[in-house]
Curated annotation (Swiss-Prot):
Subunit field text: U1 snRNP is composed of the 7 core Sm proteins B/B', D1, D2, D3, E, F and G that assemble in a heptameric protein ring on the Sm site of the small nuclear RNA to form the core snRNP, and at least 3 U1 snRNP-specific proteins U1-70K, U1-A and U1-C. U1-C interacts with U1 snRNA and the 5' splice-site region of the pre-mRNA.
Family statement drawn from the similarity comment of this UniProt entry: Belongs to the U1 small nuclear ribonucleoprotein C family.
GO molecular function, one term: pre-mRNA 5'-splice site binding
Keyword Aminoacyl-tRNA synthetase: no
This protein's UniProt keywords: Metal-binding, Nucleus, Ribonucleoprotein, RNA-binding, Zinc, Zinc-finger
Protein origin, superkingdom: Eukaryota
SUPFAM superfamilies reported in the protein's UniProt record: beta-beta-alpha zinc fingers (SSF57667)
GO cellular component: commitment complex; U1 snRNP; U2-type prespliceosome
Pfam families, per the entry: zf-U1 (PF06220)
Disulfide bonds: none
Organism: Anopheles gambiae
Matrin-type zinc-finger residues: 4-36
InterPro entries given in the database record: Matrin/U1-C_Znf_C2H2, Matrin/U1-like-C_Znf_C2H2, U1-CZ_Znf_C2H2, U1_snRNP-C, Znf_C2H2_sf
Protein name: U1 small nuclear ribonucleoprotein C
């Protein structure tokens, strides 16, 4: 009668019956051995990836990290913004470059408030609350409501 060999535990089981294998595979030592086996396998894979990356870098197949190059050279400068450039999102054409973008409404940016008027309140519904204007819906009743003063 052939015996069952467990690769994780490096041992032979007494019988090759499904019940013996099931009992063995649900045991604490077997589960620990399986966990250790895969931890070791993952460490080997990670080390292999590190070695392959290092070898490729040394062979010149991987460019050095561009973020470790340091600050840009002083003779290269970014041109200042001009009025000929298109406006940023949320900006009205012709606004100065340092001005903050306008508040966004459902149909685009809100117009600036008129002199002497307060800005509109920012009403944002909270989680689980219906949007403004909908309010609470009355419950749906399948029967007529009970009468409070029945006539006797």
């Amino acid at each position: 009668m052939p015996k069952y060999y467990c690769d994780y535990c490096d041992t032979y089981l007494t019988h090759d019956s499904p019940s013996v294998r099931k009992t063995h595979c649900t045991g604490r030592k077997h589960k620990d051995n399986v966990k250790f086996y895969y931890q070791k396998w993952m460490e080997e894979q990670a080390q292999h990836l590190i070695d392959a990356t290092t070898a490729a870098y040394k062979a010149g197949k991987i460019a050095p990290n561009p973020f470790t190059a340091g600050p840009p050279k002083p003779n290269i400068s970014i041109p200042p913004p001009t009025m000929n450039m298109p406006p940023r999102p949320g900006m009205i054409p012709g606004m100065p470059a340092g001005a903050p973008p306008l508040l966004m409404g459902p149909n685009g940016p809100l117009p600036p408030p008129m002199m002497g008027m307060r800005p509109p309140p920012m009403m944002v519904p909270t989680m689980g609350m219906p949007p403004m204007g909908l309010g609470m819906r009355p419950p749906v009743m399948s029967a007529a409501p009970p009468q409070l003063n029945p006539k006797s």
